[in-house]
Every structure is written in structure tokens, then in C-alpha cells.
């Protein structure tokens, strides 16, 4: 093995030590760490943009479908996306109502059940930001099950740019996944050519892709 690319899930410090002790270049995709090169997005700013889109559509009662608070991996992405959501609410002077938050584990199945729970609560939101497209798909499925039309009765926005988002007509924050992989590979090749090169972190932009799952 000449190099190692680690995607999404953050290694523990012990795992980092083991990888770096291999003496080969290591690059992270989807997260940052000061000890090696990385390529990622700004999850906080991107989530703020997604939430601002809902605010711009006139929504004031905005819900959040976030990752599990008891995540055993202590993954920073759900926390950062929640932080961006909260920042957008605060910047627009909107009250945060804790009962408008439900949790999934970034799968369609758990998101669908979480959305069932949210829609059964009083004073339900008129829009919801889902921290992933997979969870947004589950939310859309549950909304239909409750006799709600998306976006007429509730607006839903996701995050990631899943390949099925276009077919589901889902508004989403799209990550440049292919470019992230290309830049990680480029970073690895640079370190192979110049082993003494310092690790560096790249932050790539995301794109708000507006489709028909959000409306005023």
C-alpha cells in the first residue's frame, strides 16, 4: 500500500497513530484533522444556506431532522449541520422550538419513523431541514403517508446531492463529491512525489439546488 484515503467516518486518535505510523501519505475526505491532509466542505455554512432558503420562502416554523445525539462515532458532520441550522434561525430572529427536532441515523427508514413522530406532534412545522438526502427521502415518504403534499403542505430540504434527489424533485445542498475524491487523490500524489510536503486542508463549496420540494 502506497497511500491511504479515509472517507467520512473519523478515525480515533489511536487509529490515526496506527495509520501515520505506516509511513505513507494519508488523506481524509469529508472531515479535517491537523495531522494529515484533508478535503471537505463547510457543513456549518452550507446548513445555514439551506435553512436560509426555507426562511426566504417565508417559513417561520422550521423543523430539523438531525443525526443521533448518542452517535458512538462522535461524527462532527451532524453537529456542524445542526449548528448551521441554529445560526440561521438566530440570524433571522426565529424562535427555536425543541419539539420541532427529531433524530434519525442518516437512513431513509429511521427518518420515515422520525417524521411520523414529528407530524403527530401539535404545532407541527411548515418546513423541515433534513441533515441528509436519505433522511429527506424518508421524511417525504412519511408526509405522503400522513396525507400531506410536498411542498404544498410542508417543504422539505435535504443535504448531500444524492443521485436520487433529482428524481425525487428534492431541493438539496449538493456536495462536489467527485471533485472531493479527485482533490484527495491529487493530494496523495503530491505527498508521494514530495514526502516532505506539509499536510494541507481544502474546503470546497457546496451548491443550493432548488427543486420542487420547497415552496412559500
Residue ranges and their predicted role:
Residues 7:
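Residues lining the SAM
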Amino acid at each position: 500500500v502506497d497511500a491511504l484515503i479515509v472517507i467520512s467516518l473519523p478515525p480515533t486518535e489511536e487509529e490515526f497513530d496506527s495509520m501515520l505510523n505506516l509511513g505513507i501519505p494519508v488523506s481524509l475526505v469529508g472531515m479535517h484533522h491537523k495531522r494529515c491532509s484533508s478535503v471537505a466542505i463547510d457543513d456549518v455554512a452550507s446548513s445555514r444556506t439551506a435553512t436560509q432558503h426555507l426562511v426566504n420562502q417565508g417559513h417561520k416554523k422550521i423543523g430539523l431532522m438531525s443525526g443521533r445525539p448518542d452517535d458512538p462515532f462522535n461524527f462532527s458532520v451532524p453537529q456542524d449541520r445542526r449548528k448551521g441550522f441554529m445560526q440561521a434561525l438566530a440570524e433571522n430572529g426565529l424562535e427555536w422550538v425543541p419539539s420541532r427536532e427529531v433524530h434519525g441515523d442518516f437512513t431513509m427508514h429511521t427518518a420515515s419513523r422520525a417524521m411520523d413522530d414529528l407530524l403527530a406532534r401539535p404545532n407541527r412545522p411548515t418546513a423541515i431541514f433534513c441533515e441528509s438526502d436519505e433522511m429527506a427521502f424518508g421524511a417525504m415518504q412519511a408526509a405522503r403517508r400522513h396525507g400531506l403534499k410536498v411542498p404544498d403542505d410542508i417543504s422539505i430540504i435535504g443535504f448531500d446531492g444524492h443521485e436520487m434527489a433529482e428524481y425525487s424533485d428534492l431541493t438539496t445542498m449538493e456536495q462536489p463529491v467527485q471533485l472531493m475524491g479527485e482533490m484527495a487523490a491529487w493530494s496523495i500524489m503530491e505527498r508521494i512525489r514530495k514526502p516532505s510536503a506539509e499536510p494541507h486542508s481544502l474546503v470546497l463549496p457546496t451548491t443550493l439546488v432548488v427543486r420542487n420540494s420547497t415552496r412559500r
